[in-house]
C-alpha cells in the first residue's frame, strides 16, 4: 500500500497549512494570509439590496450575502478591490460586521463602498478581494462621525492601492 506524504512548508518557524491560513483570514491578517495563498482572499456573490443607508450618507454600497461555512475575515474595515461581471475592477472600502452605529442587531453583513463608481450592480455577481485590514469595527457617536471615518478609510484605501502594482 502506498502512503502519501505531504511536504511540510515552514516559514519563520511557522508550519504553513490551510488551517494556519484560515486562522490568519479569520483574524483579519489579510496581507500575511494573501502572501501564503499567492492571491487575495476573495468573496464572490450576487449584489443584494440592503437598507440603502450608505447611499443616503453619500456612500452607496454593494451588499454581499454569504453562505454559512464561507470563510469571512474578522469584523472590521478593509481595503478591497471589487471586480464586476464585465471584468472592470475598482478599489473599495469594505465593512464586515454588525454595523453598530446604525443597527442594534447581530446579523453580520459585508458592505463595500466602491470608490469613484456610480451605477447599479443589483443582481450582478461581483468578486471582492481583501487586501488589508484598515481597522476594527467600532460604534461611532453620530452618523457625521461615521461619515468622517469612511472618508478617512477611503483615503487610506486610495493610498494603499496607489502603491500596489
Task: Provide a role label for each language-model segment.
Residues 1-10:
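Single conserved hydrophobic/aromatic residue that forms the stacking wall/gate
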Residues 8, 41, 82:
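Short beta-strand segments in beta-sandwich/barrel cores
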Residues 10-14, 148:
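Residue-level marker of intrinsically disordered, low-complexity segments enriched
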Residues 11, 20-23, 133-136:
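Short, flexible active-site loop motifs that bind/organize anionic cofactors or intermediates
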Residues 14-62:
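Anionic-ligand-binding alpha/beta catalytic cores of soluble enzymes and soluble regulatory domains
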Residues 50-165:
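Phosphate/ribose-recognition catalytic cores of enzymes acting on nucleotide-derived substrates
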